[in-house]
């Protein structure tokens, strides 16, 4: 059967030899030792003598090449990888072709192949497979490359061990050499895939889509159009796969819209204090955030958008022209920027676009407002941000490394933030306090203190906005607010550790619960260090709400209202939202800030160092007297502490019950079912138990059920007061 297959195959090969008489130039050898791809014509034009060894049986059954793949002009111009061949003999010829000896490759037969010198495998590096005799090389190619190949339209995609994957620069710009083992090269899209099963599925997906070599090359040569998205009356061009950071240089996440709106309201509120403001978007990507600042705030801000990637800088400049904003490069207006605007169009402002490392830029220039939004953690840029930030300026930090902050990768949190955390019911506020603590330590190293304006932790990011207070006194006061937290793993009660350097004999006494006395073993752990002071500034949040109403940002108003309720720790029914009545004079923790239009940056700086020190001193005194008015730290999840067999009251009613009991209470944006209150966990559970109803009535009348439930509630409340461990509610975390 093999001889018959060989006889049927030889006429076909002779026809191919007669047709493909094309002279192929000798390719230059790669300096790295990696063989260059061999043209189709060079391999197909070699004659196959009758004495040559018969190919594998699978080759005789290989189907003919499809017309779309054989007659495509794009394939004639392009070169496929050397691991993609028609026959096993073509792989053997590559040992001579890669050495540049095309004459010997064209006249290759079994005699001179066996009598040849030692040859190396064309698909393996020299350190993996050394040069050997022809019979060993033939056996190596057949067993380790040809038998595990993937067939597609008459071609065999053999396994390759060469370092074919291109290296990519990292964030700093250094080349990263990634180790790569055996892999396949797709004949259609030239992708590199490591496993054979994955390669089969990859080719199958191409076939299901009807893609061939010619159609894929034609589609890839056409430049994909850029999509234009609109957000807050700002148009931005985005690249294909803009929402996948691994597949694009300019990442744009539509889910971060709330983050961008919060930062815009922050800058708008700061612009009422003094103008113009020097603003920096350190990681521009598409430039959407800086474009919103310049387009809506106008001459009140001087925006600088920075990015290290050259493609992102080009995209930012295109988006500036798309929004009728002139681009400034190196303090000079970009050439040909006037030609972009048509007659009658108005220039809405200027934006400076820079291409440098964010740390270098923040060391070179001083700013009033800095926003950091790197891909991942932001701890590598905090020292540079506080180095040249102006007094009473604002630094906003967006952290997207939620796997470490939300206690999914605790070792990463210990490495980046130097703190110990576990997964708790209040893990989102714990993440916000971790970031604030890192920001406070970075500011203290630069002899600066901070005042937290607000902190937001949602599903995709953690946003922290702080005001900078210059001076060692403010730095010392800020450093004192970084403390450790004692957390009970049974009932999840928590309390910040007392100040002092003396070692306490029994730290369990600080916890309000008695789980250590009623439960075996060690019940509490130490978390932190964390920020222990307030996370919100009510006055600044009200000004942000006013700016959101002024600019018509309806999507963010609900969140800002929730932050205001949370900062004052009051139910929503006891608070009314209204615009500030006197915008010329507002107080924030003892600091009176003028917000008239006449205030400029020069007048603000000219007030002198002594005057600013007096303002900071008054701020410290006011903060000491207002410690009791701060919102209570952390919150309780009402579902986490529910009683089995009991129906909980509605959340709004439960807030009223806690308020009637004399406790401060409010909802929290960290958890939709969370309750922020200064009530201890034992009182929280007793009130929750008091107003819960049994789930099963048993067919009794309503009056009997009500009296029985009241007796049951009374007994359970007495039991909860006497036994603080409360076996029904205590669960191991």
Swiss-Prot record:
Keyword DNA-binding: no
Subcellular location, record wording: Nucleus, Nucleolus
Region (Disordered): 1-78
Residues that coordinate or bind Zn(2+): 488, 491, 513, 515
Motif (Nucleolar localization signal): 135-139
Recorded GO MF terms: tRNA (guanine) methyltransferase activity; tRNA binding; zinc ion binding
E.C. number: 2.1.1.-
Crosslinked residue numbers (Glycyl lysine isopeptide (Lys-Gly) (interchain with G-Cter in SUMO2)): 585
Zinc finger (C2H2-type): 184-206
Transmembrane segments: none
Major localization listed first in the record, in broad terms: nucleus
GO annotation terms (biological process): tRNA N2-guanine methylation
Domain of life: Eukaryota
Key words, A-Z: Isopeptide bond, Metal-binding, Methyltransferase, Nucleus, Phosphoprotein, RNA-binding, S-adenosyl-L-methionine, Transferase, tRNA processing, tRNA-binding, Ubl conjugation, Zinc, Zinc-finger
Stretches with biased composition (Low complexity): 39-49, 57-73
Function statement: Specifically dimethylates a single guanine residue at position 27 of tRNA(Tyr) using S-adenosyl-L-methionine as donor of the methyl groups. Dimethylation at position 27 of tRNA(Tyr) is required for efficient translation of tyrosine codons. Also required to maintain 3-(3-amino-3-carboxypropyl)uridine (acp3U) in the D-loop of several cytoplasmic tRNAs.
PANTHER family associated with the record: N 2 ,N 2 -DIMETHYLGUANOSINE TRNA METHYLTRANSFERASE, TRMT1-LIKE PROTEIN
Protein's recorded name: tRNA (guanine(27)-N(2))-dimethyltransferase
Protein's organism: Pongo abelii (Sumatran orangutan)
Highest classification ranks of the organism: Eukaryota, Metazoa, Chordata, Craniata, Vertebrata
């Amino acid at each position: 059967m093999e001889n018959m297959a060989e006889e049927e195959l030889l006429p076909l090969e002779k026809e191919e030899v007669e047709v493909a008489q094309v002279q192929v130039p000798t390719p230059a050898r790669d300096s790295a030792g990696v063989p260059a791809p061999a043209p189709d014509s060079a391999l197909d034009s070699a004659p196959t003598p009758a004495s040559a060894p018969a190919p594998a049986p699978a080759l005789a059954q290989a189907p003919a090449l499809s017309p779309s793949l054989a007659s495509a002009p794009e394939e004639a111009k392009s070169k496929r990888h050397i691991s993609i061949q028609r026959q096993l003999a073509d792989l053997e010829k590559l040992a001579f072709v890669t050495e540049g000896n095309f004459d010997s490759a064209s006249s290759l037969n079994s005699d001179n192949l066996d009598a040849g010198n030692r040859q190396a495998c064309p698909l393996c590096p020299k350190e993996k497979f050394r040069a050997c005799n022809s019979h060993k090389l033939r056996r190596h190619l057949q067993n380790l490359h040809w038998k595990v190949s993937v067939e597609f339209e008459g071609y065999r995609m053999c396994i390759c061990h060469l370092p074919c994957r291109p290296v990519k620069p990292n964030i700093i710009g250094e080349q990263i050499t990634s180790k790569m083992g055996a892999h396949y090269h797709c004949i259609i899209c030239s992708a590199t895939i490591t496993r054979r099963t994955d390669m089969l599925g990859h080719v199958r997906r191409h076939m299901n889509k009807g893609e061939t070599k010619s159609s894929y090359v034609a589609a890839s040569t056409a430049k994909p159009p850029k999509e234009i998205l609109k957000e807050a009356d700002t148009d931005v061009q985005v690249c294909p796969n803009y929402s996948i950071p691994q597949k694009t240089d300019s990442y744009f996440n539509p889910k971060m819209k709330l983050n961008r709106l919060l930062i815009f309201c922050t800058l708008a509120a700061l612009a009422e204090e003094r103008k113009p403001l020097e603003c920096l978007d350190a990681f521009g990507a598409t430039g959407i955030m800086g474009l919103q600042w310049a387009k809506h705030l106008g001459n009140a801000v001087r925006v600088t958008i920075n990015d290290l990637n050259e493609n992102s800088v080009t995209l930012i400049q295109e988006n500036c022209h798309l929004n009728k904003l002139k681009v400034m490069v190196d303090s000079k207006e970009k050439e040909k920027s006037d030609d972009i605007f048509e007659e009658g169009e108005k220039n809405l402002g200027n934006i400076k676009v820079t291409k440098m490392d964010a740390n270098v830029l923040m060391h070179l220039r001083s700013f009033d407002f800095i926003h950091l939004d790197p891909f991942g953690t932001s701890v590598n840029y905090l020292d540079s941000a506080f180095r040249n930030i102006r007094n009473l300026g604002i630094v906003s930090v967006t952290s997207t490394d939620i796997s470490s902050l939300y206690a999914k990768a605790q070792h990463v949190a210990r490495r980046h933030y130097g703190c110990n955390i576990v997964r708790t019911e209040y893990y989102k506020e714990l993440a916000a306090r971790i970031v604030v603590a890192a920001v406070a330590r970075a500011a203290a190293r630069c002899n600066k203190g901070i005042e937290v304006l607000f902190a937001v932790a949602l599903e995709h990011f953690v946003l922290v906005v702080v005001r900078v207070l210059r001076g060692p006194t403010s730095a010392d006061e800020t450093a004192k607010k970084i403390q450790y937290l004692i957390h009970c793993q049974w009932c999840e009660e928590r309390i910040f550790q007392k100040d002092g350097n003396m070692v306490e004999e029994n730290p369990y006494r600080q916890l309000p619960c008695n789980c250590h006395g009623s439960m075996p073993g060690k019940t509490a752990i130490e978390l932190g260090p964390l920020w222990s002071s307030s996370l919100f500034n009510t006055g600044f949040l009200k000004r942000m709400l006013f700016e959101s109403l002024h600019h018509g940002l309806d999507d963010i108003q609900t969140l800002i209202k929730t932050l205001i309720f949370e900062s004052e720790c009051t139910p929503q029914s006891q608070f009314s939202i209204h615009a500030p009545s006197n915008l010329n004079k507002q107080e924030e923790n003892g600091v009176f800030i003028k917000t008239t239009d006449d205030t400029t940056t020069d007048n603000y700086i000219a007030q002198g160092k002594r005057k600013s020190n007096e303002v900071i001193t008054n701020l410290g005194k006011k903060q000491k007297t207002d410690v009791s008015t701060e919102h209570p730290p952390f919150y309780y999840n009402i579902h986490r502490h529910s009683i089995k067999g009991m129906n909980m009251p509605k959340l709004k009613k439960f807030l009223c019950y806690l308020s009637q009991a004399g406790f401060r209470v409010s909802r929290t944006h960290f958890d939709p079912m969370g309750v922020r209150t200064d009530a201890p966990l034992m009182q929280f559970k007793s009130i929750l138990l008091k107003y819960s109803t049994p789930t099963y009535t048993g067919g009794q009348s309503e009056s009997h059920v009500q009296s029985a439930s009241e007796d049951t509630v009374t007994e359970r409340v007495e039991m909860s007061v006497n036994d603080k461990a409360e076996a029904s509610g205590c669960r191991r975390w």
